[in-house]
Amino acid sequence: MHRPLPDAPAGVPADDPRHQRVRDAVRALVAEHGVAVSMDLIAARAGCSKQTLYARYGSKQALLHQIGREGMAATRLPEAPSAGTLRDALVAFAEAHLAHLAEPQTLGTARLVTAQAQEFPEEVAQIYVSYAGALVDRLAAWLQQAMRRGLLRHDDPHCAAELLLGMIVGLDFDRQRHLAPHRDTPEARSQWAAFAIDSFLRAFAPPAPRY
């Protein structure tokens, strides 16, 4: 069990230019140093003082947590699922998630952070909470809405979210990590995304009405 991370103090909007500089610095430095990145390095890269970072974000953990949540924002879903847009929304989500995983910075960061797991177990575990864990929670909440609206059969939404993410990613991220041939074009990723979503929707189709 890992301690939940506090959110950054209020007043740090994602579109603030100063925050954007910090965000860019964090993403670049985590790709270079993994979880060993320090607030001194972040401050130097972002062009601010370490004291400013602590005043705005509270701690390195809270800062990484906020950047992690913002990194997942690209894989958005509509606020509420509907019958007419369910498939299209999930396909768009899958395509965005696969595109994010295909970014060189994402792949490099994953390799580096995994290699640091023995040396920094708590920090690496919190990276999971901030990124993959938060994504599962958000997707589960959305799927639960779809289940309540009768668009999907009722089941454990967290299990459904984990299964769906596994279907979307398949083995392709492992192929990339091991330098094996993979789906390296948007067209190939889109084709797989549609296949994964259609398979998921068949598996979780609501029961036919009884007359």
What are these regions (language model features)?
Residues 1-7, 92, 96-98, 144-149, ...:
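C-terminal peripheral helix-coil segments that are non-catalytic and often amphipathic
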Residues 91-123, 169-172, 208-209:
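Helical hydrophobic small-molecule/effector-binding pocket
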Residues 59-65, 74, 123, 127:
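Short amphipathic alpha-helical segment with a characteristic S/N-K-E followed by hydrophobic residues
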Residues 65-94, 99-101, 105, 109:
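Amphipathic alpha-helical linker/stalk segments
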Residues 1-45, 55, 61-62:
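Basic, helix-initiating cap at the start of DNA-binding domains
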Residues 84, 107-108, 112, 122-148, ...:
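Amphipathic alpha-helical packing segments from all-alpha helical-bundle domains
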Residues 51:
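Key DNA-contact positions within bacterial/archaeal DNA-binding proteins
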